């Protein structure tokens, strides 16, 4: 009898299924009754992204740069682009944590992950104090302007109108300068692209 082809095919099938069988055997051997060891996790391990704190606004670029430690910041012609913000692994939050964060001051620049991180706390508090100082200065300047207007009457209103016109004129000039620069930049890019395609054809 010729058993060689049958044995060879069985060995071939057995060795192809060997890695899965080994994994199944390992999972079966590490059951709850085997020395109290925990079974291996089935999902692949993903490294958690290190985050020093969470910003109240992602528009605050300085805060995002400070809080997200492993983001690679790339200079592009228009602005600085953060890579690595997409789909970070999130831990589940309880309702208690949600109420605590809502109860905290919403004007804070950011919220630190560790309470022992003193640099983070000073950074977040400094941002809050700066915003409060700015708002106080704006209020004080508005109060002084109101005082001047009440004393001078019609002259003050006229001065405010003239100042408003000057500001609008300056804004219009700055906008026209910006558009001129954008147009020049676009023309330079088009020229570069045409030059590159011209070089490739010859």
UniProtKB/Swiss-Prot annotation:
Top-level division of the source organism's lineage: Eukaryota
Cellular localisation: Secreted
Any one Gene Ontology BP term: regulation of systemic arterial blood pressure by endothelin
UniProt KW keywords: Cleavage on pair of basic residues, Disulfide bond, Secreted, Signal, Vasoactive, Vasoconstrictor
One GO MF term attached to the UniProt entry: cytokine activity
Propeptide: 26-50, 74-202
Region of interest (Endothelin-like), residue spans: 110-124
Site residues by UniProt (Cleavage): 73-74
InterPro entries assigned: Endothelin, Endothelin_toxin_CS, Endothln-like_toxin
Signal peptide segment: 1-25
Family per record: Belongs to the endothelin/sarafotoxin family.
Protein purpose: Endothelins are endothelium-derived vasoconstrictor peptides. Probable ligand for G-protein coupled receptors EDNRA and EDNRB which activates PTK2B, BCAR1, BCAR3 and, GTPases RAP1 and RHOA cascade in glomerular mesangial cells. Also binds the DEAR/FBXW7-AS1 receptor. Promotes mesenteric arterial wall remodeling via activation of ROCK signaling and subsequent colocalization of NFATC3 with F-actin filaments. NFATC3 then translocates to the nucleus where it subsequently promotes the transcription of the smooth muscle hypertrophy and differentiation marker ACTA2.
PANTHER family documented for this protein: ENDOTHELIN, ENDOTHELIN-1
Name this protein carries in UniProt: Endothelin-1
Top-level taxonomy: Eukaryota, Metazoa, Chordata, Craniata, Vertebrata
């Amino acid at each position: 009898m010729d058993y060689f082809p049958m044995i060879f095919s069985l060995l071939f099938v057995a060795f192809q299924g060997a890695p899965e069988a080994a994994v199944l055997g390992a999972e079966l051997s590490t059951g709850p009754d085997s020395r109290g060891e925990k079974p291996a996790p089935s999902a692949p391990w993903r490294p958690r992204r290190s985050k020093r704190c969470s910003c109240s606004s992602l528009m605050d670029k300085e805060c995002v740069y400070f809080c997200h430690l492993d983001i690679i910041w790339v200079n592009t012609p228009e602005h600085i682009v953060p890579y690595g913000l997409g789909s970070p692994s999130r831990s589940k939050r309880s309702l208690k944590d949600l109420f605590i964060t809502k109860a905290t001051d919403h004007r804070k620049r950011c919220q630190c992950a560790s309470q022992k991180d003193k640099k983070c706390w000073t950074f977040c508090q400094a941002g809050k104090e700066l915003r409060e100082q700015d708002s106080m200065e704006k209020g004080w300047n508005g109060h002084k302007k109101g005082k001047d207007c009440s004393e001078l009457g019609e002259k003050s209103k006229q001065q405010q109108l003239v100042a408003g016109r000057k500001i609008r004129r300056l804004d219009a000039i700055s906008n026209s300068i910006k558009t001129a620069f954008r147009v020049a930049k676009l023309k330079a890019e088009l020229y570069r692209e045409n030059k590159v395609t011209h070089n490739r054809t010859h």
